[in-house]
Amino acid sequence: MLGTVEGDLHDIGKNLVGMMLGSNGFNVVDAGVDVTAASFVSAAKESNADIIALSGLLTTTMIYFPVVIEALGKAGLKDKVKVMIGGAPVSRAYADEIGAEGFAEDCASAVDEATRLMTLVTKSI
């Protein structure tokens, strides 16, 4: 599942990542743009997501990446899903800082990162 974080309407990168993941066998659920933390949580539950990919282009929206991760924790989903982030203002160091398990700098590396994250996914029965 992927979406652009709250306050960000940019979708080209998100759409490219979605197409690359889909063409590599991933079932992709696109939550859209300007997605609130609560909407990410709802969509993750509805889609039974294994990975949530958060996208953002604006530095002003970076504050919403950890908000989504915190909301996933409060909803009891953080141990069931892996979070991957990407976009111009974010980095591997930022992913580590906010508790995201994955980072992709472009759509090609997003496929590799999602594949790696799938090996870490554990679903509760």
Name the predicted role of every residue range:
Residues 111-125:
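A charged, well-structured terminal subsegment
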Residues 1-13:
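Long amphipathic N-terminal alpha/beta scaffold segment
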